[in-house]
């Protein structure tokens, strides 16, 4: 058999590995690159129509985001994933397609005056729907035949609802070889979902290394920490605004808030309202509720057996329309507002920041990672004011963060996972980690007696009865090395300008329905700016 490493090698996003075995070609994940692009993903070495099937570890876009493009370009095989992953991909891929269409529309508006050729979105909602029709849901822990000589089993890995490690048995001639793809290995004791299931045997292992060089801080008591924040904020008469990722983190927060409200832990404010103001989060929450209870951890199942919905917060209010969203801030009752996006770069959360950042009685609570350059990161690092919808907004609210809420295993967790094999695999391929992190984790594994390596994008390996042989080294040239430092700096600055333009378009759309006088003034300001810079 032959393996080609196409993405998320010496970087974290864009996961994809192609296998050619037992007369079949298939992919493990087909994700979109996100954030800084250190090593470019390699293109598929064959036409999409020549791919027989795809196996998906979990629903996050960096593992699934190019599936609509695959369908657009002629792939007609099956996409296998756990049943919850199929459900989550149904909403997440459509959401991603809406973003692709929006960005293409923005670029075309921008290029129309200059006579630039129109651009097409990477893929459309129609492509996403076509990809979703190719999904086939499989049960956890059930060994299935994908093709003659190829069998698979999906094992819960505790990263996200539906996440899995994938065991593969590949028989060629008289030899059967077992491969294990870890997927994203989960952190211990996450709410709602099960902890990672360890696998006992494999010949070859392909494992992630996101936190391969460091451990998480000690896990705090999230409920106790959250109670303190709610208590002091509500006592001041303010709101707690939570920028939250729609899938996973929002449901974890609902789990904590249900316990807080049911036990009456916030004194004097027992009936405080909780709002979900994100259409994607609302859909994801519905999927969590409808999922087979067997996917949940023991604590969650125990609640369900008592007739308690673990994420049904008393007083929970779902905001559907834009008007619903706007009305939230007309009510001065102290409340919790869960809204996307988690890094405050887009979505309804920006409206809530506009209405609450300037109020010293309010709190903005961050519960997830904030990337460099995002509004969320800016607020956490400390700033006196920010611009929202063209207005300078003073930052007087309390800014705080619940640390340690990670869905990924840390270094010790990764080592627990790989050391659970009863015999050391013949080789461990380290993937899905930043450049130096992968190298350090390879060193750690080597010190513990494993044979390990970290292939680059484009690397090819053959695996047979005699072992694994590298056929082709991947590309070790970093993107910034190839383009040159000066060009890279220029590209970065221009990308800032492009991002500002996208933000302007969002601001324009958010002002739909405003007073004519205000809209006219806004239009005059934009036209004056364009007249100044049009070349």
Label every PLM stretch briefly.
Residues 229-375, 386-387, 422, 437-439, ...:
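Hard-cation-handling environments
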Residues 52, 203, 335, 362, ...:
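Conserved acidic residues
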Residues 191-206, 293-300, 370-396:
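Short, compositionally biased "basic patch" segments
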Residues 150-154, 287-295, 415, 465-476:
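Short, surface-exposed amphipathic charged segments that create phosphate/polyanion-binding patches used
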Residues 387-418:
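Generic long, charged, amphipathic alpha-helical segments
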Residues 100-105, 292-305, 387, 469-495:
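A polyampholytic, Gly/Pro-enriched intrinsically disordered region
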Residues 1-55, 60, 64, 71-252, ...:
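His/Asp/Glu-rich metal-coordinating catalytic cores
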Residues 458-518:
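Charged, amphipathic alpha-helical linkers/stalks
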